[in-house]
Every structure is written in C-alpha cells, then in structure tokens.
C-alpha cells in the first residue's frame, strides 16, 4: 500500500448499532463489522441503558475482529475516528473511551466525528460530489435541510419543529403492532394498501420555508386506529399506504422550498444529497427523485445499507477530516447534542 494512502479506523456507537470499519482514502472498505442490537424490539424503541451495556459487551471484540479481517495491524492505521455526538450519551462514552485507548496506545491521531457529518459526507465515497450541495437528513433522530459548504462548514435552512421522520415511522409502526424498527415494515405493508383510504394532515405545506412538523400526522394516525374496533391486515396496509403517501407529499413540498432557498443563497448549488435511515425507503426515493428532476437538480443517496448507522461512514468522515489536518486532542468529551452548523464556523466558504 502506498504511503500516501490514508487508512482510518471508524467507530460508531451513537444509538443501537455497534459498528467498526476500516476504510482508506482510495475509497476502499478494508473491513466492516456491525451488530444491530435486537434487544430493543420488544420495547418498540431504543432503551438507552440497554444500548450502552450492549456497546460495552460487543465493541472490543468487534474492533479486534474488524482489524483481523482487514489483515492490517494498528501500526498500519493512520488515525482513529469515533462518533462523539450527537446521540445517546452512554453509548457515545463507550465508543469514545475505546477510541481514546487505541489512540493513546498507538500514538495515532484521534478524530472526533459529528454523527450527522458522517451521514452528510458518506455519498462522497461513492460519487464525485463537489461542494457546495444541499443536504436533507431524514433519520430516527434528525430531520433537517442544510447547505454543505465544506467539511465542517454547514448552514441550516430548516428542521423539524417536533418529531423526526424516522421517529414517526417507528411510532406509527408501534401503534399498528408492527414491531421495531418501523420504517421497513411500513414500507412493505404500504405496497398492499390503498394510499387514498385516509386523508392525513400535511402540516406546513401551505407555508414558505422548509421546516417540518409531524406531530399532527402522528396524532391523526392514532385517531384512525382508535376509531376502528378491529384492526385487520387490510386496515394496516391502507393506513401504511396513506401515511407513506402523506410523508411523500410533505417531503416533495419541503424539497421544492429548500431548493429555491438554497439557489437564492448560492447559485452554484445544483445537487441534493438525501441521507439517514428513512432515505433507504424506495418509494420515498422515487418521489424525491422526480421532485429533484423537476427542479433540474441531481439527487444522490448513499447505498441503502449505509443510510442507517454504520462504521464505514465514520471512517470515511475521518478520511475527509484527516486530509484537511482536522484532528482532535485527547481531552474532548462526547456530546448528546452537537448541531452540525456549530462545526468550525470560521472556515471560509470556498
């Protein structure tokens, strides 16, 4: 391996996935290990205490296995990248402590990674996407539009005023007794349903801006369920289809507004990147693709398996930061909240 090629170990423990990966600056994945904690399914959502203990139990062995699979040693690693926030603080502490231990023992640089930045940058591992671009993050914890000017340089255009979109998928699935996580099963059920069965509220779509509000949609679904004495599979499919159709309409409306806002700020912007767990939904992808095309925008998604949390995106974000010499001191602390727009705000917009 040429010396100019950078190799980064990435560690992700912000929620209920324990993940480790080794990637390089040639955009190659040398190893990737991920363990999705099934313990949360019976609770219909992530239990922070259970997640933290699972990371403690699994992360060390997963890291060793990842290094062995890559056929490298720690001496071949140029830096350690670790999610430092935002996320569940217990899990973040576990990942950060392991990463700091590796960095301390090896003398390698450590890079604290903003989890949302990792979602934002992972598409650049697969496509040639130059800055600036418009970003939509739709995940279990976040729902927001940002302009990405560079690594570490973001400008927020809008966000959810209440629930994140992924959270609403999970809560609707829980109401319908479909299990956790809710996104994949609602998408599957919607294929057999009638999307015109129920009229659901499309909050804020009559207004300018690109903020979201999903609390009314969640309440409307709950009311429909409560008004039916018997919940059969047909009703579940119809509710799922109507819900997903409503979400698609909201996304299209908000994307139209966000594109107009981004172009007014910077005329160079002609690309939309959509990432986060909800971005794996095929039907919503099709809706957003048509919307972007109607606005003469190119749209990009990460591979579906990398829309949800993973170690590859942390490793790649580490590469993006390392090539700019953005490394961290060992005394940083994990952060439950860490807005993207607060990163290196003094970087010049190139």
Curated annotation (Swiss-Prot):
This is tRNA N6-adenosine threonylcarbamoyltransferase. InterPro entries: ATPase_NBD (IPR043129), Gcp-like_dom (IPR000905), KAE1/TsaD (IPR017861), TsaD (IPR022450). Belongs to the KAE1 / TsaD family. It is found in: Cytoplasm. Gene3D superfamilies: 3.30.420.40. Its cofactor is Fe(2+). The keyword Metal-binding applies. Substrate binds at residues 137-141, 170, 183, 281. Keywords: Acyltransferase, Cytoplasm, Iron, Metal-binding, Transferase, tRNA processing. The gene is tsaD. GO terms for biological process: tRNA threonylcarbamoyladenosine modification. Binds 1 Fe(2+) ion per subunit. Its EC number is 2.3.1.234. Required for the formation of a threonylcarbamoyl group on adenosine at position 37 (t(6)A37) in tRNAs that read codons beginning with adenine. Is involved in the transfer of the threonylcarbamoyl moiety of threonylcarbamoyl-AMP (TC-AMP) to the N6 group of A37, together with TsaE and TsaB. TsaD likely plays a direct catalytic role in this reaction. GO terms for molecular function: iron ion binding; N(6)-L-threonylcarbamoyladenine synthase activity. It comes from the Bacteria. NCBIfam families: gcp_kae1, T6A_TsaD_YgjD. It catalyses: L-threonylcarbamoyladenylate + adenosine(37) in tRNA = N(6)-L-threonylcarbamoyladenosine(37) in tRNA + AMP + H(+). One of its GO terms (cellular component) is cytoplasm. Fe cation binds at residues 115, 119, 309. It comes from Ehrlichia canis (strain Jake).
């Amino acid at each position: 391996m040429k010396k100019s090629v950078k190799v980064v170990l990435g560690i992700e423990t912000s929620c209920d996935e324990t993940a480790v990966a080794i990637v390089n600056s040639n955009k190659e994945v040398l190893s990737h290990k991920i363990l999705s904690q099934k313990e949360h399914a019976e609770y219909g959502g992530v239990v922070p205490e259970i997640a933290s203990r699972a990371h403690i139990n699994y992360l060390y062995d997963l890291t060793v296995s990842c290094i062995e699979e890559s056929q490298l040693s720690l001496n071949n690693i140029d830096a350690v990248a670790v999610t430092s926030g935002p996320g569940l603080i217990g899990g973040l502490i576990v990942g950060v402590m392991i990463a700091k231990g590796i960095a301390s023992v090896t003398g390698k640089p450590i890079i604290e990674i903003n989890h949302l930045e990792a979602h934002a940058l992972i598409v650049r591992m697969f496509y040639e996407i130059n800055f600036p671009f418009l970003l939509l993050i739709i995940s279990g914890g976040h729902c927001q539009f940002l302009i990405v000017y560079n690594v570490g340089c973001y400008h927020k255009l809008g966000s959810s005023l209440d629930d994140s979109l992924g959270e609403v998928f999970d809560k609707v699935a829980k109401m319908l007794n479909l299990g956790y996580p809710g996104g994949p099963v609602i998408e599957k059920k919607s294929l057999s349903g009638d999307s015109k069965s129920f009229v659901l509220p499309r909050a804020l779509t009559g207004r300018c801006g690109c903020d979201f509000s999903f609390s009314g949609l969640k309440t409307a679904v709950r009311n429909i369920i409560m008004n039916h004495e018997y919940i059969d599979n047909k009703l579940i499919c119809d509710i799922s289809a109507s819900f997903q159709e409503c979400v698609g309409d909201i996304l299209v409306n908000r994307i139209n507004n966000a594109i107009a806002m981004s172009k007014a700020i910077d005329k160079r912007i002609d690309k939309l990147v959509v990432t986060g767990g909800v971005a794996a939904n095929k039907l919503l992808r099709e809706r957003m693709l048509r919307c972007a095309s109607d606005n003469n925008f190119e749209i990009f998604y990460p591979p579906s398996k990398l829309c949800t949390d993973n170690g590859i995106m942390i490793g790649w974000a580490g590469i993006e930061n390392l090539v700019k010499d953005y490394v961290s001191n060992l005394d940083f602390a994990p952060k439950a909240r860490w807005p993207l727009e607060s990163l290196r705000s003094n970087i010049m917009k190139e």
